[in-house]
A protein has these predicted regions:
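Non-catalytic interface/targeting segments
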Residues: 1-56, 115-122, 126-127
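Short Gly/charged-rich anion-binding patches and loops
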Residues: 20, 86-88, 105-108
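Short active-site-adjacent helix-start/loop capping segments
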Residues: 45-47, 80-83, 109
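Short, charged beta->alpha transition segments
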Residues: 56-63, 109
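Mid-chain, well-packed structural core segment of small domains
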Residues: 62-99
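Beta-hairpin (beta-strand-turn-beta-strand) motif
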Residues: 74-79, 103-104, 125-127
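A short glycine-rich beta-strand->turn/loop micro-motif centered on a GG-aromatic cluster
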Residues: 97-107
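Conserved phosphate-binding catalytic cores of ATP/NTP-utilizing and phosphoryl-transfer enzymes
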Residues: 109-115
Length: 128
């Protein structure tokens, strides 16, 4: 993904997603190859890969910021994949709503909800 500053794994603050595809994302005059978490504290590199099984450890950063996230949009890559029931219960316990969709839809929805001032986070798997 061309243009902007190189992203080193964490960018503080709220950022809108300017572009996605080509295996990465562009936001806040930065670009990142790979998956990302968009959280109240900032944007973080995320080790999730399209098609790999979901695990609680992938969402530890989200759990740590639960007070600032009422809704988590999960961009599952190209195809939507369900979360295991135990993981869904963990989100319920923390009162974080979930919406799973493909990454393109999640990125667009995230931008709209951030612009509205909502307490939203996004976990976005990169797509080509």
């Amino acid at each position: 993904m061309a243009g902007g500053k190189r992203y080193d794994g964490f960018a503080p603050g709220r950022h809108l997603i300017d572009a996605y595809g080509g295996g990465g994302f562009r936001f806040g005059d930065m670009s990142h190859k790979g998956s990302i978490l968009m959280l109240p504290s900032g944007v973080k590199a995320w080790a999730a890969i399209d098609g790999q099984p979901w695990s609680a450890s992938q969402f530890q950063d989200v759990f740590s910021e639960a007070a600032g996230v009422e809704l988590l949009l999960i961009g599952c890559g190209v195809d939507i994949r369900p979360l295991p029931e135990a993981l869904r219960w963990r989100f319920r316990e923390l009162r974080i709503g979930l919406d799973l969709m493909n990454t393109a839809a999640a990125a667009r929805t995230y931008n709209i909800l951030v612009a509205e001032g909502r307490k939203v986070g996004a976990a976005l798997i990169s797509v080509d």
